[in-house]
């Protein structure tokens, strides 16, 4: 399957409010988070058929990501990204999606200097052995 996964389906710059971080105030006050998803997929059937049934609905990817970011609180954005990746792989057709890249940005991270954002990026392949502990 990996040799067919040269196509990409991306949802970039999704914006949510969440309570993620290790500091006490980060658990109380919502702060902005941005998430990008890049699915490594086989989009040939969808390209030929023009049928939503032959691809992954990016509206459902947005809703799934929103539920995770705006729901449970994580200490680390690494754990948040891993939870999103697991959920995306669980919710998508294994014949279509073989891997997902997740980038989580925290533009209001509690740093003492000027910066644009803090970002974590992960790649999870469906056929990789699970290495994440958090769920």
Task: Give the positions of each predicted feature.
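N-terminal, polar/charged subdomain of small-to-medium soluble alpha/beta proteins
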Residues: 1-135
